[in-house]
């Protein structure tokens, strides 16, 4: 059901997950899935959202982070559930004949309360990326809030970025 939030056509091929309620160690999820008709657009070019950056597995681990960056500054510390690291690693296999025309830019931010590192590359029918979101404090002090705000706004921006693809030979077909 979780993967179908990406697309009603998504089909899980395999999944492996640690115990999600064991907070003594990192949570690892590996999910192989196919999502036919996941791309947007018609004609030669298509737009592809980065699936795992839609944070479909983030219900228990990231939901308290979103919507916390409204004010420009804070008088009091911002309380979060916990400090944490969310590392997204994904490989997307493109259909035969597709090439990548434009990738989102890399991001490398670090500060006293949060960090964000995003790298993406394409090669021979695949797109590979890593996105490392690090929340260093469970209470973000007012002096460090600007860093937290900047990192979270950039992360939220990344969740909406797309990869532009093109079908070799000039015509994209479904």
Language-model-derived ranges and their functions:
Residues 1-174:
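A sensor for short, sequence-defined functional sites
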């Amino acid at each position: 059901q979780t993967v179908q939030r990406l697309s009603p056509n998504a089909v899980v091929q395999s999944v492996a997950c640690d115990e999600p309620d064991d907070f003594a160690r990192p949570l690892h999820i590996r999910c192989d899935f196919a999502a036919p008709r996941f791309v947007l657009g018609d004609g030669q070019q298509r737009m592809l959202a980065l699936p795992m950056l839609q944070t479909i597995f983030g219900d228990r681990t990231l939901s308290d982070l979103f919507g916390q960056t409204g004010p420009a500054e804070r008088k009091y510390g911002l309380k979060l559930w916990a400090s944490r690291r969310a590392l997204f690693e994904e490989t997307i296999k493109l259909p035969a004949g597709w090439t990548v025309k434009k990738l989102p830019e890399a991001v490398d931010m670090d500060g006293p309360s949060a960090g964000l590192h995003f790298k993406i590359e394409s090669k021979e029918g695949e797109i590979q990326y890593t996105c490392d979101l690090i929340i260093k404090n469970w209470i973000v002090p007012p002096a460090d809030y600007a860093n937290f705000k900047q990192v979270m706004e950039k992360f939220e921006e990344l969740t909406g970025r797309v990869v532009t693809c093109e079908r070799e030979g000039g015509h994209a077909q479904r």
